[in-house]
Swiss-Prot record:
Protein name: DNA-directed RNA polymerase RPB2 homolog
Record's miscellaneous remark: The binding of ribonucleoside triphosphate to the RNA polymerase transcribing complex probably involves a two-step mechanism. The initial binding seems to occur at the entry (E) site and involves a magnesium ion coordinated by three conserved aspartate residues of the two largest RNA Pol subunits.
Subcellular localization(s) per the UniProt record: Host cytoplasm; Virion
GO annotations of cellular component type: DNA-directed RNA polymerase complex; host cell cytoplasm; virion component
InterPro entries, alphabetized: DNA-dir_RNA_pol_su2 (IPR015712), DNA-dir_RNAP_su2_dom (IPR007120), DNA-dir_RNAP_su2_hyb_sf (IPR037033), RNA_pol_bsu_CS (IPR007121), RNA_pol_bsu_protrusion (IPR007644), RNA_pol_Rpb2_2 (IPR007642), RNA_pol_Rpb2_2_sf (IPR037034), RNA_pol_Rpb2_3 (IPR007645)
Documented EC number(s): 2.7.7.6
Family annotation (Gene3D superfamilies): 2.40.50.150, 3.90.1100.10, DNA-directed RNA polymerase, subunit 2, domain 6, RNA polymerase alpha subunit dimerisation domain, RNA polymerase Rpb2, domain 2
Reaction it catalyzes: RNA(n) + a ribonucleoside 5'-triphosphate = RNA(n+1) + diphosphate
Assigned keywords, A-Z: DNA-directed RNA polymerase, Host cytoplasm, Late protein, Metal-binding, Nucleotidyltransferase, Transcription, Transferase, Viral transcription, Virion, Zinc, Zinc-finger
Similarity remark: Belongs to the RNA polymerase beta chain family.
SUPFAM superfamilies referenced in this protein's UniProt entry, alphabetically: beta and beta-prime subunits of DNA dependent RNA-polymerase (SSF64484)
Length: 1242
């Protein structure tokens, strides 16, 4: 039968005319990709998949409980006949509703909106409703059975955290107007959780690809004789199913062992051949054949493999020595049951009972069917397939041992997956649900059967016992544990006093600006922190940019310092994370394809002798084919048609081992790429005709030749349609113009870096591209904010990705309806004169400042910046800073109000209570230090004195900086407790010491606010807003900022905004002509006057507009720590650190430069010495040992020299003295040498 072929044909590539397509037009393809999926759409889709498929699948399929226990009840004669009771129950329906909360004033439940949860400190969670079927069976000694059944109607068990913006959220599919009406940001994408009033993000987590063999060399350690290991995690399905791991080890003794990691199997290294014998393959030759495939082959590789395998069979294993050469599989299974089984406490006690032995053996095989390679099947009829697959795994490990193939690249995204919030929460839910729901139900039934005779049980008894087990405490356990897994971030959480490993990685959502919010939602974390924290080569490799990153992981954005360097990454701008696809339909299509022979129809010898390629789907070996390349190409064309294969299916041909892999599992990174078509078939035919004509002596044989052409079908008109909104990415996929590629399949592609490279090799038949890329796609959103990033040192771009997330701006549009702690709202934000594609998706967070690059006095050394006072007065970088004060009424004896001094005691001395109205300072009131902002009193119980009825518990404002009361609220908490919530507003103008940054990562600190009259100016009267040290650029190589200033100068004079996205071409000649048209020099430098003397500067000054951002590091917040006194460490006497301990402020490098610029060197000495731990130390000049000085009685004494001592005073530090004491305690003496006395004549 002829295989099915694709039906759609595309027009000749020679007719495609896209010569007008520019690199700027190619940016529209990025816009199409972002508009299609959204910047965080994958996160919402992952959670929706959990709600619609994951939770129902987990509850219904994985928690079908079937346990039998010995009956303990013996009250009656019937009870004594009852030997055991079997408890069976399964959940028949699972439903998760939208968030609700109880309205205590009305006594009913109402919808819980996200902003209500934020203000009231609630968790945005939806009710979880379950329905179940219960079967209780009593087994009597006379063989009789009695069955009781009950159907549990749906009822609420607990609540589950709901993601903002998901299909279970009240804002789902709401219009922008409707979102405004409920106090939500109309442009906010969602993708986060609200737990106990705070906003949290579940990070994307790197994980290894399941159903894939990962082979690694093992470091030789003491007591470990392992050379190499292969790890294989088998998971049926592709998303939420349970997995099982096996570890295959090759030891220095030549032994090959297999360890099965499962909760039903004790960890034990079993000789590999025993697994084959247990499944019915007893002959050594047939076992070895499963690994080498062809015993008759005389190839060196085959011969060496057979030698290794034969040696491994004869290596003595002390544990399995009794069955090492045992051919009887029943005895092997029985021996294994005694060693590794967990389902019976003492298997050896059953040896005398043949029926019991047979039962144990069958039970053991049934467990092995479920936990050994379950993705290949979980029934007895799949055992042969499993053995063949296990032989293939050992075969690949032996090839690595012989250095035929390299070990697995641990850092390549070809063998990795990125799991979103849905998969992470599913892992936590499995463990928590088992502990907080399943265990109480089982215990509840056991208690019921202990108290009530089985024959007296009714359906009502069973339903009541089931419901009582899932009481309020159980509901709170499940809900509280899920919240804890999101909030705590701990590796271990406690559920019913039982530790459970938390596999959810989260971070608090700090809304500094919209870029910060989106970056937090696109963070990818590597959770292997054990190896990363070590100073090893492996730790260094984990942090490097891998060759598989471009297009999927941003190559520029990561932490710039600390342990998170290279461990916390960002998705590239067009990257997306796939959910699990429909495997069954594709599997059936592949098995029905005549080009594929099913695995059962192919022998191992045929695979080698006929050169067959293996075919896998989600890691399951389903068959073989004769032409792997043709099969992969044919199904890629099916995918391009969009009929048989889903567009997000991964089709990968591994030419090294000749395998075709189809992947539809969850967590695959994918990105769209434009397809490149060519006329290779016509070209080959023309070359063949030309060669034939030449053979025949035709002198005009060259006329038969045609040029080779390769091109993309994407045109400039399509780019315009995308920008106009009439063409989407889905349309491009449906038309076969682009397709989705994963890191695996990228290895089968030859991708042109840009449209320019494609055109350069348009007729080069030796470089046939499969796709063309957009250069900007290798960067993430934060990196694309930097203009001309490809001209800037990469480290500076990395700094900008972190600084851009700390800048002040508009953190959300719903700020009037929110009460946030430590949030800065910048008044004026401008669109940059040189914008980038990132500004299409995030609000700009800065100003176009006029910057002069020059030295002007001594106040802009290093990173110091001189700021124009008029720029500050005009509101440059000005904004509002918000704090919150939250007070709870802890009991019914407390109330809000203005304390009456006649009947209230413990009033705060010196406090001002006059501004209180009904317990709160009114909105718009200015409060200062010492003002009471929230009045609260508590009634003294049992107090008979009429003058002391109440005690004051008011909140006093304790900051030196005045504030304005911006909002006052009285929300109710989850248990109807009343809160007092106040939002305070502070003015945050630019101050000396505040930090700024350009978009090229060049950070500066305001060192001087210079009056307008002293600022330099150009011939046109233009004065700079900032004066920046030009020496900060050559060493940092921030060429992108220089280009931005030059282009911005031309744009400002001509009144246009241009695109400065990275990798766009820069025409220096055209830029110089634009400047010349405006009467400037070709390089943008201008003649300037000294504002203080009025004289010309000798050199031309480079001046122009540069986009600057203000970082949220405010000097006013740190002034509390600037003093000559404060708490100190008891041992060293040094000031404490941090606001919590009221400690001092760290004097950093940039602060040091500011003080140096101000000529305050003595201040530095004073703060780092006198105000720290400076002290006087007394030392004997004769022996160099410490001396003793009594301050109350001026007595100097040396323990060594006594009266001959010559003691001198030395300016020292307490930390130095403590160090010397520690060294002497370690028996290491330290002596000091003092300069001799110098006597001056009178």
């Amino acid at each position: 039968m002829e295989p099915l072929r694709p039906q759609i044909t595309y027009g000749p590539i020679e007719t495609v005319d896209n010569e007008e397509l520019t690199e700027a037009d190619m940016l529209s393809f990025i816009s199409a990709a972002v508009n299609s999926t959204g910047l965080i759409g994958y996160n919402i889709k992952s959670f929706d998949d959990l709600m619609d498929n994951g939770i129902p699948q987990i509850v219904k399929q994985m928690f079908n409980v079937d346990i039998t226990y010995k009956d303990q009840r013996d009250h009656t004669e019937i009870d004594k006949l009852r030997e055991s009771v079997q408890i069976q129950f399964n959940f028949t329906d699972v439903n998760i509703e939208r968030p609700q909360h109880r309205n205590y004033s009305q006594g009913n439940k109402i919808n819980l909106l996200p902003n209500k949860a934020r203000l009231c400190g609630l968790s945005y969670s939806g009710p979880v409703n379950l329905a179940a079927e219960v079967i209780l069976t009593a087994h009597y000694s006379n063989g009789r059975q009695e069955v009781k059944r009950a159907s549990i109607p749906p009822f609420q068990v607990s609540t589950f955290p709901i993601m903002r913006g998901s299909n279970r959220c009240h804002t789902h599919h709401l219009s922008k107007t409707a979102k405004k009406e409920i106090g939500e940001d109309p442009n906010e994408p969602g993708g986060y959780f609200i737990a106990r009033g705070g906003e949290w993000v579940v990070d994307l987590l790197e994980n290894i690809r399941f159903n894939t063999l990962h082979i690694h060399y093992h470091t030789m350690q003491q007591g470990n004789n392992e050379i190499i290991r292969g790890e294989f995690i088998s998971q049926p399905g592709g998303a939420f199913e349970n997995s099982s791991q096996i570890i295959i080890r090759y030891m220095t003794t030549g032994a090959i062992t297999i360890e099965i990691n499962s909760t039903k199997f004790s960890k034990l290294r079993i000789p590999w051949y025993l697994i084959f014998r247990m499944f019915g393959m007893t002959g050594d030759d047939s076992i070895i054949e499963q690994v080498v495939f062809d015993l008759e082959s005389n190839s060196p590789v085959n011969t060496f493999m057979i030698e290794i395998l034969e040696k491994s069979i004869h290596v003595l294993d002390p544990i399995f020595q009794p069955v090492q050469h045992e051919p009887n599989r029943e005895k092997i299974i029985q021996f294994l049951s005694e060693k590794v089984s967990k389902f019976v406490s003492n298997p050896s006690a059953y040896k005398s009972d043949e029926n019991a032995v047979q039962y144990l053996n069958e039970r053991q095989l049934t467990i092995l069917d479920k936990i050994l390679l379950p993705h290949m099947g979980q029934t007895a009829d799949t055992r042969v397939r499993k053995l063949r697959f296990l032989g293939l795994l050992i075969h690949k490990i032996l090839l690595v041992i012989m250095n035929v193939f390299p070990p697995t690249d641990r850092d390549s995204y070809r063998t990795k997956r990125v799991h979103g919030s849905g998969v992470s929460l599913a892992k936590a839910f499995k463990a928590i649900f088992n502990t907080s729901v399943i265990a109480p139900i089982i215990n509840g039934f056991k208690e019921l059967l202990k108290q009530t005779a089985f024959e007296e049980l009714t359906q009502r008894n069973i339903i009541e016992a089931f419901s009582a087990a899932l009481s309020k405490n159980t509901a709170s356990d499940l809900n509280r544990s899920m919240e804890q897994s999101i909030i705590s971030g701990n590796k271990t959480i406690m559920v019913r006093q039982r530790p459970i490993v938390n596999r959810v990685s989260t971070q608090s959502l700090e809304r500094k600006n919209l870029l910060n919010t989106i970056s937090a939602l696109r963070t990818v974390n590597t959770h292997n922190t054990t190896n990363a924290s070590k100073q090893t080569e492996r730790a260094d490799m984990m942090r490097r940019v891998h060759a598989s990153y471009p297009g999927y992981i941003c190559v520029a954005q990561s932490a710039d310092t600390g342990e998170k360097v290279g461990m916390s990454k960002q998705l590239a701008i067009t990257a997306n994370v796939c959910t699990a696809g429909e495997v069954l339909s594709l599997k059936q299509r592949l098995l029905s394809d005549p080009a594929i022979q099913q695995l059962a129809d192919v022998s191992n010898k045929d695979i080698v002798r006929k050169g067959l390629a293996r075919v896998f789907i989600n890691g399951e070996w389903i068959g073989c084919c004769t032409n792997a390349f043709e099969l992969a190409q044919r199904y890629r064309m099916f995918r391009r048609e969009g009929k048989i294969v889903h567009p997000h299916t991964t089709i990968y041909w591994d030419s090294m081992v000749d395998e075709v892999e189809f992947w539809l599992d969850v967590g695959r990174l994918t990105r769209p790429l434009l397809i490149v078509d060519n006329n290779i078939e016509k070209y080959n035919q023309a070359c063949y005709k030309a060669a034939e004509a030449r053979k025949k002596g035709d002198k005009d044989w060259e006329k038969h030749k045609i040029p080779f052409i390769q091109n993309t079908r994407f045109t400039s008109q399509m780019a315009k349609d995308i920008l106009a909104g009439t063409l989407t990415l889905e349309d491009l996929v449906a038309q076969g113009i682009c397709e989705f590629i994963t890191p695996e399949e990228a290895e089968n592609c030859l991708v042109a870096f840009s449209i320019i490279e494609l055109r350069k090799h348009k007729h080069d038949v030796t470089r046939r591209f499969t796709h063309v890329d957009v250069p900007q796609a290798i960067l993430g959103l934060a990196a694309l904010v930097s203009p001309y990033a490809n001209c800037t040192q990469p480290a500076r771009v990395t700094y900008e990705t972190n600084q851009g997330r700390q800048t002040g701006g508009w953190y959300c549009f719903s700020w009037p309806y929110r009460v946030d702690m430590n949030r800065f709202f910048q008044f004026y934000n401008e669109m940059p004169l040189v914008k980038t594609i990132a500004h299409n998706y995030v609000i700009p967070n800065g100003l176009n400042t006029i910057v002069a690059y020059m030295i002007y006095g001594g106040y802009n050394q290093e990173d110091s910046v001189i700021v124009s006072q008029s720029f500050i007065d005009r509101g440059g970088f000005a904004g509002t800073f918000y704090r919150e004060e939250k007070v709870e009424l802890e009991s019914d004896i407390e109330s809000f109000g203005k304390p009456d001094p006649l009947i209230t005691k413990n009033l705060k001395p010196g406090a001002n209570y006059e501004k209180l109205v009904d317990g709160f300072v009114p909105v718009g009131t200015v409060v200062k230090k010492g003002d009471i902002i929230i009045g609260k009193v508590a009634k003294i119980r049992g107090e008979k004195d009429e003058l002391n009825k109440y005690i004051d518990r008011s909140v006093m404002y304790g900051f030196d900086e005045p504030a304005v009361v911006d909002a006052v609220m009285r929300p109710h908490g989850p248990n109807d407790e009343i809160f007092g919530l106040m939002r305070l507003r502070y003015e945050r103008n630019l101050n000396i010491g505040d930090k700024m940054s350009s978009r090229s990562g060049n950070k500066g600190i305001a060192a001087l606010a210079l009056p307008t009259s002293d600022m330099p100016f150009t011939e046109d009267g233009l004065q700079p807003d900032l004066i920046v040290n030009p020496h900060s650029h050559p060493s940092r190589m921030t060429n992108g900022q220089m280009i931005e200033t030059t282009v911005g100068l031309a744009n400002a004079l001509q009144g246009v905004v241009t695109d400065g996205t990275a990798f766009l071409p820069i025409n220096v000649q055209l830029l110089s002509e634009r400047l010349a048209q405006e009467g400037l020099r070709f390089n943008g430098c201008q003649k300037m006057f000294n504002g203080q003397t009025g004289e010309y500067f000798d050199a031309a000054i480079f001046i122009g507009p540069t986009y600057h951002q203000r970082l949220q590091k405010f000097v006013l917040d740190d002034r509390y720590a600037v003093a000559s006194y404060g708490p100190t460490d008891a041992l060293t006497g040094q000031p404490l650190d941090g606001k919590r301990s009221h400690g001092g402020l760290r004097l950093g490098e940039m602060e040091h430069w500011v003080l140096t610029a101000q000529g305050a060197m003595q201040t530095i000495i004073e703060k780092s010495h006198d105000d720290s731990d400076g002290c006087i130390s007394y030392i004997c000049r004769n022996c160099g040992e410490p001396a003793i000085y009594n301050a109350s009685h001026p007595i100097y004494k040396c323990m060594n020299c006594d009266v001959q001592a010559d003691i001198g005073m030395v300016d020292s530090r307490r930390s130095s003295i403590v160090f010397q004491h520690e060294m002497r305690a370690a028996n290491v003496n330290i002596t000091s040498v003092l300069s001799p006395r110098v006597f001056q004549p009178a």
